[in-house]
Amino acid sequence: MSDLEDSILPPLKWLFDQNPPIPENIRDWLMESGSMTLRLKKYCTCFQVQRQRECFIMRDKLKEEAEHLPKSARYWLREVILMGDNKPWLLGRTVIPQETLLHNQSLMHLGTTPLGHYLFNNDKLTRDYIHIGQQGVLWARRSRLRLRDKPLLLTELFLPDSPLYLHHK
């Protein structure tokens, strides 16, 4: 992607009033408080992270994400596709203020390691909230997490082949 304003994530509609109603099995996935990576891995024999973009961006490129993060000189952006048995399951976008990276430099060097492996093996991780959203018929979620009390924003869009939809088709 040549234009930094482009994202692998399409525009998402955030649902704050639970309308439309969220099926219970879908809600269970979207409200997962543990590692989504570990949950997804239970449904495949081959799990991969395909990196799409990793770079620093300025605040003006964040759009509405800026409302969820403190002002920073710049932000680390990581966009990936999580694959299960060679099928795209999830689009992930992580935005990390530079200050969060001070004690978490490894976040810039994950390569094909899932973000969840780093986050959920860290005893200094907390979650402020999970917002549920949609893009057409696809479900999404956005979480503000904190490492050592420093925020990062993770947005995940569950693609059609994702196991989230297995019992809902």
UniProtKB/Swiss-Prot annotation:
**Where is the protein found, in the record's own terms?**
Cytoplasm
One of this protein's GO BP terms? ubiquinone biosynthetic process
Q: Which pathway does the database say it acts in?
A: Cofactor biosynthesis; ubiquinone biosynthesis
Q: Which GO terms describe its cellular component?
A: cytosol
Where this protein primarily resides, as one coarse class?
A: cytoplasm
Q: Which UniProt keywords apply?
A: Cytoplasm, Lyase, Pyruvate, Ubiquinone biosynthesis
Q: Which GO terms describe its molecular function?
A: chorismate lyase activity
Q: Give me the residues that bind substrate, please.
A: M36, R78, L115, E156
What HAMAP family does the record point to? Answer: UbiC (MF_01632)
Q: What does this protein do?
A: Removes the pyruvyl group from chorismate, with concomitant aromatization of the ring, to provide 4-hydroxybenzoate (4HB) for the ubiquinone pathway.
What name does the UniProt record give this protein?
Probable chorismate pyruvate-lyase
What lineage does the source organism belong to?
A: Bacteria, Pseudomonadati, Pseudomonadota, Alphaproteobacteria, Hyphomicrobiales
